[in-house]
Amino acid sequence: MEIESKFKRICVFCGSSAGNKVSYKDAAIELGTELVSRNIDLVYGGGSIGLMGLISQAVFNGGRHVIGVIPKTLMPREITGETVGEVKAVADMHQRKAEMAKHSDAFIALPGGYGTLEELLEVITWAQLGIHDKPVGLLNVEGYYNSLLSFIDKAVEEGFISPTARHIIVSAPSAKELVKKLEDYVPRHEKVASKKSWEMEQIGLSPTCEISR
């Protein structure tokens, strides 16, 4: 059954590897299916391998638009065979993140490695600074992100992250529950930077950061 969503496009960060558990692959396909059921298009890192390949194929097969953003230098490594949807080749990693953010109404991280964490933490930081107010979610497959969430809680306890900024990131063990939480998300944190800051211009976001239609 199709469900109307307030999101037009969601950016998904995930590994170019599939991981060691079948549950990670299943979660990528499940998330892709959930996006399709809500008529949401996908923005992702552009690769055709690992979890990136699985979710992009699931969304594309479901009839939704797929936008892949990938640095030219990574194309030989992360693309094998045919890609699906629209592929945007960019100059570097910074431009990749900027383009992904610009085209998305929310962010979700599937399990992944250093690159996934770097992308995730950057969009969380942008939210904390007030550069955007788009929701950020973790698909916490079989507790994959429990240690990261514990670290964030420790940073709050030690005074490095404010309690309200802790609420920037939401998590859930299933795609359906996570997307519902993102739909219901309301920012609570105080924004640090001016909305007309240079960072906003760098990543190409509008001052109001409204969901694009």
From Swiss-Prot:
Keywords: Cytokinin biosynthesis, Cytoplasm, Hydrolase, Nucleus. One of its GO terms (cellular component) is nucleus. Coiled coil: none annotated. InterPro entries: LOG, LOG_fam. It is found in: Cytoplasm; Nucleus. Expressed in roots and shoots. Detected in the vascular tissues of roots, cotyledons, leaves and pistils, in the shoot apical meristem and in immature flowers. Substrate binds at E78, R96, K97, G113, Y114, G115, T116, L117, E118, E119, T125. Optimum pH is 6.5. GO terms for biological process: cytokinin biosynthetic process. Signal peptide: none annotated. Its EC number is 3.2.2.n1. It catalyses: N(6)-(dimethylallyl)adenosine 5'-phosphate + H2O = N(6)-dimethylallyladenine + D-ribose 5-phosphate; 9-ribosyl-trans-zeatin 5'-phosphate + H2O = trans-zeatin + D-ribose 5-phosphate. It holds the Pfam family Lysine_decarbox. GO terms for molecular function: cytokinin riboside 5'-monophosphate phosphoribohydrolase activity. Cytokinin-activating enzyme working in the direct activation pathway. Phosphoribohydrolase that converts inactive cytokinin nucleotides to the biologically active free-base forms. NCBIfam families: Rossman fold protein, TIGR00730 family (TIGR00730). Belongs to the LOG family. This is Cytokinin riboside 5'-monophosphate phosphoribohydrolase LOG1. It comes from Arabidopsis thaliana (Mouse-ear cress).
